[in-house]
Every structure is written in structure tokens, then in C-alpha cells.
Amino acid sequence: MPKLDLDAIPQTNATGYPPEFAGVVQGRWYRRLAPAAGLEDFGVSHVVLAPGAWSSQRHWHEGEDELVVMLAGEAVLVDDHGETVMRTGDVAAFAKNDGNGHVLQNRSDAPCTFVAIGRPADTACHYPDIDMHLFAGADGQKRKDGSEF
């Protein structure tokens, strides 16, 4: 069936971040829509950020394009160009390998909801503000020097 029942898709706030970097995403709740729909060529997540929560640590991907569509509420997009308020209906796109680290932060007093679309990639992910890096083909993040957390 093309229409997805969001309530039937498990919601989680799991993260692969090490504890020292995980606090800001504890209020991020997401559903992986692509597996539920049988989609294989790209990933889609339905994301709700509680007040104060971030979508991720600020990051950029070498081999993954990303697109975000705000469905409800308000978040602040923080990237190398500064800060941009994102409201219902706004769209942001992040081209792979552009070097522009980005994150959505919910600074409001109400939840916000968005859909994030990307492509599963086995390429590096850079985190410019913290000592963390996802190396291509690696199983989880490591410090920028390659050492384990």
C-alpha cells in the first residue's frame, strides 16, 4: 500500500554517537520510512525534534546528497553560511561533498517535524565542530585521528 501508517512504523531515538556527543540528539525521535515502504535506493526518515533537540551533530557527507522538508514547527538550520530559520514548507538541500556542515536545532518551545531524504552511502562523514569522524566503510564513528572512543 503506498500510504504509510506512521503509527505502525517503530519510532526510536537511538544514536550511534558516543556518549560525549549524544546528549543533543536524545530528543530526536525518528521513523525509518524507506524500509517500511520497501524502498532500497534512498533513505527517508520522519523526524520529530523535541524542544532543545538537534537533528545530529553538525556534519557533511562525502558521498550522500541530503534533502530536508519541514512539515511542522520551526527549527534553526546552522551551517557554514550562518543560521536560517526553517518553518513549515521550507526545504533545504545539501549536495554531497560540498563541505558545508549542517544541523537542525529546535530552539522553540514546541516540537518540530521534518522529513529527511538521503542515500545510503559507504563514504566518509565529517563533523567539523567535534573530534569525531565516520571513515568510509567503518563500523561507527571514531576520533579524527582514527582512534576508538
Put a short name on every predicted segment.
Residues M1-D41, C125-F149:
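A short, N-terminal "cap"/entry segment at the start of jelly-roll beta-barrel domains
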Residues W29-R32, S45-H61, D98-G99:
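Conserved short histidine dyad/triad with adjacent acidic residue
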Residues G38, K96-T123:
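Ligand-binding loop in jelly-roll beta-barrel domains
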Residues H46-A50, H61-L77, I117-P120:
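Short, conserved beta-strand element in jelly-roll/cupin
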Residues A50-W54, E74, E83, D98-N100, ...:
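Short, charged/polar surface micro-motifs in flexible loops or helix N-caps
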Residues D80-K96:
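Short acidic-glycine-tyrosine-enriched beta hairpin
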